[in-house]
């Protein structure tokens, strides 16, 4: 079973400067529409070859557009031995719906 976090809880953890890594697994075209500040851009299909960029010793919140792909990514990472991954319930849609910050990607 995949652990999840909602937008409000994640926002509070980030405001409290907790050590949380955000990973945006959407496509570059989706990311171009905006992303959660300070998220690592790691398209879902690249996770198996870039897994070393995801730490096992801190909480990692994975998100996509609606939460479905990120749920699958969390399940995959858990199978690979990652115990501290969380799915952002509702994805960036829920994040935006709550009026939380979205920024343009760098570069």
From Swiss-Prot:
Ranges where the Rhodanese domain occurs: 16-104
Gene3D superfamilies: Rhodanese-like domain
Disruption phenotype: A mutant strain lacking rhd_2599, tusA and dsrE2, although not viable in liquid culture, is clearly sulfur oxidation negative upon growth on solid media containing sulfide, and shows massive accumulation of intercellular sulfur globules.
InterPro entries the record matches: GlpE_sulfurtransferase (IPR050229), Rhodanese-like_dom (IPR001763), Rhodanese-like_dom_sf (IPR036873)
UniProt-annotated location(s): Cytoplasm
Enzyme class: transferase
EC nos: 2.8.1.-
Function: Sulfur carrier protein involved in sulfur trafficking for oxidative dissimilatory sulfur metabolism. Component of a sulfur relay system that starts with the sulfur-mobilizing rhodanese-like protein Rhd_2599 (Alvin_2599), which transfers the sulfur from a low-molecular-weight thiol, maybe glutathione, to the TusA protein (Alvin_2600); TusA serves as the sulfur donor for DsrEFH, which persulfurates DsrC; persulfurated DsrC very probably serves as a direct substrate for reverse-acting sulfite reductase, DsrAB.
PANTHER family according to UniProt: FAD-DEPENDENT OXIDOREDUCTASE, PYRIDINE NUCLEOTIDE-DISULPHIDE OXIDOREDUCTASE
The protein, known as: Sulfurtransferase Alvin_2599
Organism in which the protein naturally occurs: Allochromatium vinosum (strain ATCC 17899 / DSM 180 / NBRC 103801 / NCIMB 10441 / D) (Chromatium vinosum)
Lineage start: Bacteria, Pseudomonadati, Pseudomonadota, Gammaproteobacteria, Chromatiales
Gene: rhd_2599
């Amino acid at each position: 079973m995949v652990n999840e976090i909602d937008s409000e809880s994640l926002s509070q953890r980030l405001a409290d400067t907790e050590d949380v890594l955000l990973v945006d697994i959407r496509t570059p075209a989706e990311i171009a529409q905006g992303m959660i500040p300070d998220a690592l851009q790691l398209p879902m299909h690249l996770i198996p070859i870039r897994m070393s960029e995801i730490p096992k010793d801190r909480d990692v919140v994975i998100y996509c557009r609606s939460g479905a792909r990120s749920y699958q990514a969390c399940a995959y990472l858990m199978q690979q031995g990652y115990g501290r991954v969380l799915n952002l319930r509702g994805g960036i849609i829920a994040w935006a719906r709550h009026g939380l910050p979205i920024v343009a990607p760098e570069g």
